[in-house]
């Protein structure tokens, strides 16, 4: 076992012809009165109706990280402790800082510092998928759209220019934007463009001289990061991570100031490799589920950049990730363990 920062990498070396990577992030989003996690006995009022359906006599694991993704981490730890006769060599990766800006991502740091630690023929990330397969992922970028004004006393507003009022046009463009559903290699990815934060003003009696609308764009894997950025701010705006504010030369936010905050590429489904096909076949036989598109960003994109085919497969519903009542039925953990155990033996 090797460690880089808060990321642990453990590998078997039995001389198998192929190597499979099992990866899971250790961090969660902030708690919302849902920590520490705990088991809920059948009938507990905290068990959601949609989770209880079909699992009436089952315990549920409740609390922050239950689905995203401590449940899957637990399954991988179980496999690491018990699976001694796998037909592939295995690398387990448990990493930090997945839920924050890409520059802090523990997997990214390991890849940059020790690329030989993260080598393999196929990777599975335990993001919540209801134990089905979700292929690829949307890309993501976050940026501030900025308006500028002139500060003045609010009793003499005509002496200034209100940057918050000017931001109304940013919101108008967001409201007018039509998010698209895009098919890539047989899977349908839903794009999204949303304001997630807004800030402006320095005092309650001061006309604001700046307003920032923080925007998150989730884009399908039919386009590169550069192509997605061009759709938002133009191809030659010059806005890059860490280089300050630039004016959008085209795209949705043409004419506004832009400061890039975070960006990560998308990944195509990655289901064409023989290892992926054999896993798809097993999951379909056991659950009746065909692969779906992963709508959020995950580190399958990072494996894709390394030339390693990767899919998402984990316990719990992706619809409950980050929710205050995050939870999963106990059988999801058993199903994930059984699927991976049988596929790896």
Tell me the role of every PLM-derived stretch:
Residues 1-66, 85-87, 245-246:
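Acidic/His- and Gly-rich active-site-bordering loop/insert found
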Residues 4-6, 24-26, 96-97, 126-129, ...:
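Fold-independent oxyanion-binding glycine-rich loops
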Residues 15, 115-119, 306:
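Glycine-rich phosphate-binding loop signature in dinucleotide/nucleotide-binding domains
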Residues 20-22, 93, 124, 309-311:
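Hydrophobic/aromatic beta-strand patches that form the interior of the parallel beta-sheet core
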Residues 29, 100-102, 132, 268, ...:
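Generic structural signal for helix capping and beta-alpha/helix-loop junctions
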Residues 45-59, 79-93, 116-119, 174-184:
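Phosphate-handling active-site elements
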Residues 69-142:
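Acidic/histidine-rich catalytic neighborhood of metal-dependent amide-processing enzymes
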Residues 128, 135-136, 142-345:
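Metal-dependent amide/peptide-bond hydrolase catalytic core
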